[in-house]
């Protein structure tokens, strides 16, 4: 149990950590693509692409939060701000202040203290710690500075002091510094280019010695924290998921920040209440839509779709957006299943042309299930365009319809490959797979609701989807590659549409499946490097858009990390943590 001094709601987070069994039925066969395919209809042709996890976020909760909840948060925020000012005055932004900032970030409550954090980072104390001979201080300072967009070098500013000149490896004396090794491990995932070899060595060194330390640590809380850090590296993992475990670890320490812990619990309670209300609203919409009854072979995984939105758009201010974007995600899944399981090539071509015309009359000649799907996506997309118009003064309906047209064209490419027994190159498959992942389409809708106008296009008909910046393409490619690794051997089906691994092995017959997977993991690592560079160096997009894209990339492994029983334990744990009563 969580026990926060003076906190009346401290028991809530503990109850969700162990309740994953309750969420299992709600994920609706999310544990295995094979289960979903079998449940659909075994006599239909299923393409090898598998679950195209479509990304992201939106929701408007029907749940009314009591004013007292916000008053409690406001009071706790004031307490923490007072503590930050005192700590800054006392330490001048030294280790104690940086540890506090790190805790605020890990607990997902740093957004309340942006001014205080920026002030502390600007004092120069963080830069001084960067050159410390203490591994923990130097690596923590590096990570916070890089995350804030500062130009720092892993080699020149930090790691060269901790490498043995004779062997070229990290000094063996560091192997017993568990706290420093944890921080080094966190730092090792922040490659932005040109540092891959050094940071890979840092990851190997820290991972090896942390794995060894788990066996002899006397503190069970610290041992569990180390295991969590190795299994779910901070930068690559969902911050909301990590926050619960970080809070539990903080509560095991002899020295604690009660105000910070209480605010973290209050924030969790508020978000959980919102998520539950949003989920109820989405379930009502999906049931009223009736597509699952009209098209029995389509996937019916409302909670799974919502969790993409919940992960990507975090915070109470995005509640309505989470609901709306979940609708988009669900319709991408439906369209995917229609292409996979329902339509003939001729019908799918007519479906695509109707979407391009963006006229409900154009859909009149389509089969009933396609008409219903078209009407739903037309309605939801126009509603999102109206939201953007009302809140930001820009109506992006033409860009959104263009995004749908691009997605349908991508599905048609795959349908023709299958119909003509054409075998694409791995590169061509992956390029088209970025589109059919659904990520670019979903991001277009999110960007519109967040009020983003692409400065690189002058005409409304032009869209960011035409020139696909890395902030969009990287999460999409990460998703496609993870999806293909997870589903290539899982999906029971007739027909063959292939995965990246299949096409790579065809082009490289001397390679084994294990080597193909290693190659794919290397591609994923390179996409993370490019995404990191966009997030931490270039800063060409607003921070809220960057965070959406980063959160999406982090969610991918949660959706596709199957265990030996073909279950998704992290997804189940995360759903229980954030949604179960």
From Swiss-Prot:
Its main location: plastid. GO terms for molecular function: (E,E)-geranyllinalool synthase activity; magnesium ion binding; S-linalool synthase activity; sesquiterpene synthase activity. Mg(2+) 1 binds at residues 336, 340. Mg(2+) 3 binds at residues 483, 487, 491. It is found in: Plastid, Chloroplast. Its EC number is 4.2.3.48, 4.2.3.144, 4.2.3.25. A motif (DDXXD motif) lies at residues 336-340. Keywords: Chloroplast, Lyase, Magnesium, Manganese, Metal-binding, Plant defense, Plastid, Transit peptide. It catalyses: (2E,6E)-farnesyl diphosphate + H2O = (3S,6E)-nerolidol + diphosphate; (2E,6E,10E)-geranylgeranyl diphosphate + H2O = (6E,10E)-geranyllinalool + diphosphate; (2E)-geranyl diphosphate + H2O = (S)-linalool + diphosphate. Its cofactor is Mg(2+). InterPro entries: Isoprenoid_synthase_dom_sf (IPR008949), Terpene_cyclase-like_1_C (IPR034741), Terpene_synth_N (IPR001906), Terpene_synth_N_sf (IPR036965), Terpene_synthase-like (IPR050148), Terpene_synthase_metal-bd (IPR005630), Terpenoid_cyclase/PrenylTrfase (IPR008930). Binds 3 Mg(2+) ions per subunit. Pathway: Secondary metabolite biosynthesis; terpenoid biosynthesis. Residues 1-34 form a transit peptide. SUPFAM superfamilies: Terpenoid cyclases/Protein prenyltransferases, Terpenoid synthases. The keyword Zinc does not apply. The Asp-Asp-Xaa-Xaa-Asp/Glu (DDXXD/E) motif is important for the catalytic activity, presumably through binding to Mg(2+). Monomer. This is Terpene synthase 2, chloroplastic.
